[in-house]
């Protein structure tokens, strides 16, 4: 066996990005369980959701930054930070899987958050700047920064947009995904209201 054929040592610095990417790769095979319980035969994966949600977040952020004072902000959003928060927000599911709402309701928010935090520590230990990415994830969970709140809006908007797409393809009984939505930014509400209008226009 040549030196290039040797497997990477678990102590090799070059192995760490691959260990991290194994978690990212796992999200491509992990279905979003909410759609499964709703009867969607071939639902999107967590990776599908994260990719589109990242774009929703970026589009919202860039639009908000054109007139950020009108959205209740004192300064423009950090678009690079938003992209990082969006990309890490569901990484814990590579270990915990996409827990259905009925499970998280029984476990409680505190238990779920503790498990997610442990999973994120395990995943991000392979990154050179692991503390930064853990902080990005915490910003999403807490929603205590303008960027974290924007990504939380984008997460819900992507779900609702996906529900809209499934309904346009003939799926029924997805009304629960449209209910009781609260928004941090007026632009997010506008996005939702436009989807709502289109939904009823096509019904």
Predicted regions and their residues:
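Alpha-helical, largely C-terminal catalytic domains
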Residues: 1-203
């Amino acid at each position: 066996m040549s030196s290039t054929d040797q497997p990477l040592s678990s102590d090799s610095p070059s192995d760490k990005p691959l260990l991290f990417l194994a978690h990212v790769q796992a999200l491509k095979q992990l279905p979003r369980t909410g759609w499964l319980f709703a009867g969607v035969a071939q639902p999107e994966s967590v990776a599908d959701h994260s990719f589109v949600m990242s774009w929703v977040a970026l589009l919202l952020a860039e639009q908000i930054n054109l007139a950020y004072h009108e959205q209740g902000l004192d300064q423009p959003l950090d678009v690079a930070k938003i992209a990082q928060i969006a990309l890490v927000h569901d990484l814990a599911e590579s270990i915990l899987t996409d827990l259905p709402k009925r499970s998280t309701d029984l476990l409680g928010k505190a238990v779920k958050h503790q498990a997610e935090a442990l999973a994120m520590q395990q995943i991000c230990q392979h990154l050179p700047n692991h503390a930064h990415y853990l902080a990005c994830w915490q910003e999403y969970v807490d929603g205590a920064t303008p960027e974290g709140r924007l990504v939380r809006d984008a997460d819900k908007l992507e779900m609702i947009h996906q529900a809209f797409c499934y309904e346009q393809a003939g799926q029924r009984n997805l009304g629960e995904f449209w209910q009781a939505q609260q928004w941090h930014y007026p632009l997010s509400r506008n996005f939702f209201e436009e989807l709502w209008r289109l939904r009823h226009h096509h019904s």
